[in-house]
Amino acid sequence: PGLSVGPAEPTMGLRGGHVFEVSFDGCLVPEENRLGEEGAGFRTAMKVLDNGRIEVTATCTGIARAALAAAVSWAGQREIDGAPIARFQGLQWMLADMAVDLDASRLLGLRAAQLRAQGQRFSAEAARAKLHASEMAGRVTDKALQIHGGYGYSRHMPLERYARDARIMRIYEGSSEIQRNIIARNLLA
């Protein structure tokens, strides 16, 4: 009885952190160690998730920023017929779309963080920021891989890690579907 921690779960991405199963069996917590008021656990957990969604937005922005920088660098270095692939208009449009997506996510995250810092309600804004940023990170890493061609699929390139790490962002701190529910609930309230 009590607290038990299982073995580390191997994960596809985010290998800098570890995932463990934690079990509480007959575990008694003294009242002075309780977080929040009795019966308010769900509300407390939701506030933690709202804060976490801003952090996920920042993480997604960082992943996408690194992927975009890699794509821009590669487009300037990689040559076809003696000229960089950056000369192709289609590739330029991909880079432009990636940059716009990245800026939109950054600004949505800043708005949610600003509301939090001002002590205002920010649940819907955090959900919007997290939804956009997590899906944006997937789009941007995918386009960066496309720009790199076959080299982008290599495990020797950092894009492999960015793509793996971007994928979990649409799941934790509430999946994209949950974010849509939160946003819609706030719109319809």
Describe every region a protein language model picked out.
Residues 14, 120, 127-189:
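Alpha-helix capping/hinge segments and adjacent helical runs
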Residues 72-86, 99-132, 145-153:
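C-terminal helix-coil-helix/basic helical segment that borders enzyme active sites and/or dimer interfaces
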Residues 45, 71, 112, 163-166:
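Short alpha-helical scaffolding segments that buttress acidic/His motifs in well-ordered protein cores
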Residues 62, 96, 103, 131-138:
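Generic structural signal for well-ordered, non-transmembrane alpha-helical segments
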